Amino acid sequence: MIQQESRLKVADNTGAKEILCIRVLGGSSRRYASIGDVIVGTVKDAIPGGNVKRGDVVKAVVVRTAKECRRPDGSYIKFDENAAVIIKPDNDPRGTRIFGPVGRELREKRFMKIISLAPEVL
């Protein structure tokens, strides 16, 4: 459950380490984002020489949340941390590698490139 001012770990190799959620996309009164939802964020921590710099405003898709997410079969999935992958305007990832597992919900939301790059889909 990601909302404004939530901080997320970045799970790709763009050079960003942490982003702060500015807005949850998908309606004017939308408050929370879950796995597979797109957010707008600002880079709070980055490594030198990376593709993105501290202060850059980026779009990202949430790939892991600490709050459990209910699935249609009645099961729940939750992770140890909140994490996101920075994306381009065409919803392809900006980096070339994804670190850590991602939720299966990304497949339903058509983020196939992220699914194929991820080491594990839970």
Curated annotation (Swiss-Prot):
A GO BP entry: translation
InterPro entries linked to this entry: Ribosomal_uL14, Ribosomal_uL14_bac-type, Ribosomal_uL14_CS, Ribosomal_uL14_sf
MF GO annotations: large ribosomal subunit rRNA binding; structural constituent of ribosome
PROSITE patterns recorded: RIBOSOMAL_L14 (PS00049)
Keyword rRNA-binding belongs to the record: yes
Signal peptide (residue range): none
Keyword list, A-Z: Ribonucleoprotein, Ribosomal protein, RNA-binding, rRNA-binding
Superkingdom of origin organism: Bacteria
Any one GO cellular component localisation term in the record: cytosolic large ribosomal subunit
SMART domains: Ribosomal_L14 (SM01374)
Presence of the UniProt keyword Signal in the record: no
Pfam families, sorted: Ribosomal_L14
Role: Binds to 23S rRNA. Forms part of two intersubunit bridges in the 70S ribosome.
Sequence similarity: Belongs to the universal ribosomal protein uL14 family.
Oligomer and partners: Part of the 50S ribosomal subunit. Forms a cluster with proteins L3 and L19. In the 70S ribosome, L14 and L19 interact and together make contacts with the 16S rRNA in bridges B5 and B8.
This protein's name: Large ribosomal subunit protein uL14
